[in-house]
Amino acid sequence: MNVSLKAKGISLTDAIKAAVEQKLAVLDKKVTKFGPSVNAEVEVGRTTKHHKKGELYRAEVHVRLPGKLVYAEALNKDLYAAIGAAVREAGAQISSYKGLRAEDRRTAKKTKGGRESA
């Protein structure tokens, strides 16, 4: 999986890069069956202080799968918690998409009259 990381309003430290890579390792396991053409874009940063008190961090994850774009966003007072929440949400969407694809294959086999595998 190809990963691009960018930061807005904060400096991109080695600790942030390591945290993102560690969290994305879970997603990498889920997308291996889609091939090496899967791209992930992660954006981390601080949000505007317009209506919120204190510092709020935002993490966005975009994963481009064949035929699907997965988007997840999370806000939290802790940057690392926001990264974790966004990656978990993206993982849930990828799992759901994989399940839908499997269901489509089963339906197609039923329609064609072939044997259905469990």
Whereabouts are the PLM-identified features?
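N-terminal, polar/charged subdomain of small-to-medium soluble alpha/beta proteins
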Residues: M1-A118
